[in-house]
Amino acid sequence: MAKSTREAYGEALAELGKINERIVVMDADLSGSTKTSTFKKAFPDRFYDFGIAEANMIDAAAGFAFSGYIPFASTFAIFGAGRAYEQIRNSVAYAKANVKLAFTHAGLSVGEDGGSHQALEDISLMRGIPGMTVFVPCDAEEAKKAVAAAVEIDGPVYLRLSRPNTDAVTDADTPFIPGKANVIRDGSDAAIFATGLMVTRAIKAAELLEA
């Protein structure tokens, strides 16, 4: 069944919150869209809404991390990576804070929200920060694994999540090894590399080439 990675993110947070009381979640007035509202309903005392104050949220997340918590800070990718980049670079990454950044509506896939909300630069901005682990899950199942992996990593992590529903590409048995790609299908004529939402498009492209 098709499901968005942002929806899977919210579900994974709520599930992990049951077994790890160190997890806290914060949002910048978009919990209904980022799906952190799922965690909010389950654990209202561990959820913090900062309003439209992304930079403050990131700095607070760093504070939570240095107090022993595992904070997940969420907003749209265009606002998180754009408006709060200095705080991410200095307060989180430079300080090696154990903060998890989960930004949704990433990439050229949110036409419904207008041209100003298309976050294209976020992945390069985050990959350019030393010490930042970047996960771009291709479907809901992989998104849940990415959230679980982020909890286990001691350091900053960026989860790049999408708005649209995506067909399932992986399943519970598909390996999730940070830093290692999965081979979706074998062939010898061409090699197609893809990440995130583009994996399903790459599969369709391969099918067209094969036809």
Briefly describe each language-model feature range.
Residues A14-E15, A181-R185:
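Short boundary motifs at domain starts and secondary-structure transition points
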Residues V24-D27, D189-A194:
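Short hydrophobic beta-strand segments
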Residues R46, T170-D173, K204-E207:
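Surface-exposed flexible segments
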Residues R163-V183:
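Aromatic-enriched
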